[in-house]
Amino acid sequence: MKNIAFAVALTISAAAAALPQTSVAQGRSLPTFEVDKNWPKVPAGMKIGDVSSVAIDAQGNAWLLSRPRTLKGDDKAHAAPPITIFDPNGNYIRGWGGDGQGYQWPEREHGITIDYKGNVWLGGNSCPTNGLPGLRPVADDQLLKFTPDGKFLLQIGKSNQSKGNADTANLHRPADVQIDQQTDELFVADGYGNHRVAVFDANTGKFKRMWGAFGNKPLDADSCAVISYKEFKEPGPQQFSIVHAIRVSKDGMVYVADRENRRVQEFDRNGKFIKQLMKGDAIFARDLAFSPDQQFLYVGYNKGIAIVDPKTMEYLGQIQPPGILGAGHHIQTDQKGNIYIAQTGAGMQRLLFKGMK
């Protein structure tokens, strides 16, 4: 194997390989990182489409979810499968995914998660009227569950079947999921078409509960249009816009990234609103990831990653790698504290944890 570019060129300059800047909260040490310019190592001849999401398994392997339909020209003949797996050293292990019997693969891949049992969850965010090249006019209203080797286990919802936020049988363009190990519940950031958190039994797919921003009842809106607001002042709108990411902490708190409203909201497991952090000066809350000890919550912010105290929801500082982070879409951490960044349109990046400073 050797390093090659993704289908969309991934170039890292000497500056990008330097230590990313971390703003430091006064009197408190924060994590520092270094760009890993040799990760991942894509096999020669393999072309990977836009990488929309990344998940890390118990062995430290990185699972990339990409969009093969974004490849153009001759690259299509060398397309990698939608899921590609790389070991901690960046070496390619295997790949799988795509249409199959008994399930509906998403038209536009969006989010991937590995649960504590090793099962793989994924969904998409295609909209019938998005007009994107190479996509059929369908809505991704489903989530899929597989074993690590790609055996189909469960589908929640069906393509093109959503009846809106009150629908308990279908999702509507879900962006992200998280499994709560203590309750075996599936928390869904639902998402692009709906504007809610939806909770299901992770084994049976049975619907359990849902809520909107501040714990309100979620309301329907144009399911293919982004609800955007011109002003970003506390407390913000009473409804979610795009519910783009969700994380459940070890102590049972649920953190929700409300991307277009530029805020992260915290709830208990039953949807009781606790508090929020809003940053109106730039795009905020693209995605969420905990440090391994959950002392820090990393939040996609502008062209970097915000460091937040999940207990107080206080903004502590920012990780700002030079160069290539502008298209950061999803982030994840591994057991060593490294950060993985899926950059739609610009491949992947790994930041190596270098200690506290």
Question: Can you say where each PLM-predicted feature lies in the sequence?
Answer:
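Conserved beta-strand positions in repeat-built beta-propeller and related beta-rich domains
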Residues: 64-67, 122-126, 180, 188-191, ...
